[in-house]
A protein has these predicted regions:
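Active-site-adjacent helix/loop patches that line small-molecule binding or acyl-intermediate pockets
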Residues: 1-98
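Structured C-terminal helix/loop/strand segments within mature extracytoplasmic catalytic/sensor domains
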Residues: 71-79, 83-222
């Protein structure tokens, strides 16, 4: 779709570096329609990037390794690529057919609804999963409900001390809208995989304030 650079080299979670793709059973209306074959993939090439190692140490299997963490075999999806992908999701009509995702109107509507829906409207306890739980921009550092007139279509990520939000924000009352993508690393001790990241103390408040600042700029530009 013309989105570069992107490199998806491994799964998420346990055994993410397993090169064998397990077979998938495909169901339709409780009936099996097909089974895919197991595939043995090639090992990923090292990323040709600067600063592929970060920090001063990391944990592996509960053992502290006192050397920088190597990200050269990890997935690579920079925020420039995320931002360009979001544009195609929100404004497909602005792109050539070859650059659009092959989604039906129903699929497009479902995707946007999933990106916009806050946890309480999906049946989750709002005391635990408040509106800003996965809406870092503007509301990430508050447990207030997001007003109905402010629509946030986004996808967040957090791993290895890095927080990312990629969002389309639309105020239907003030008649303003904007796209915003940002990422921040919060790993004060320089140790990866120790679960001691400053997400709540630094990362989320920073992204929330960034969203508010850009929102205010858009109000002034209007």
């Amino acid at each position: 779709k013309g989105i570069t650079p992107v490199r998806i080299a491994h799964r998420l979670g346990q055994h993410s570096d397993d090169l064998r793709t397990k077979p998938l059973i495909i169901y339709l209306n409780d009936s099996t329609t097909g089974i895919t074959k197991s595939i043995l993939n090639k090992p990923p090439l090292e990323l040709n990037l600067l600063n592929r190692t970060k920090g001063s140490a990391y944990y592996e299997d509960d053992i502290l390794i006192t050397e920088p963490f190597d990200f050269s075999s990890k997935n690579y999806f920079p925020i420039s690529s995320q931002h360009n992908l979001l544009k195609r999701v929100i404004f497909p009509q602005n792109f050539d057919k070859s650059e659009r995702f092959n989604l039906s109107d129903e699929q497009q509507e479902y995707l946007l609804s999933a990106m916009h829906t806050v946890p309480r409207k999906a049946g989750y306890d709002p005391k635990t999963y408040y509106d800003g739980y996965c809406k870092f921009f503007i509301y990430g550092d508050t447990k207030e409900n997001i007003p109905e007139y402010l629509e946030i279509y986004n996808k967040v990520g957090f791993a290895y001390g890095t927080l990312t939000d990629c969002a389309y924000i639309k105020d239907t009352e003030k008649n303003i809208d904007f796209l915003l993508t940002a990422t921040i690393l919060v790993n004060k001790d320089g140790i990866f995989n120790d679960d001691a990241y400053e997400y709540d103390e630094i990362g989320i408040p920073f992204l929330a304030q960034l969203g508010r600042e850009i929102y205010q700029q858009e109000l002034k530009r209007k």
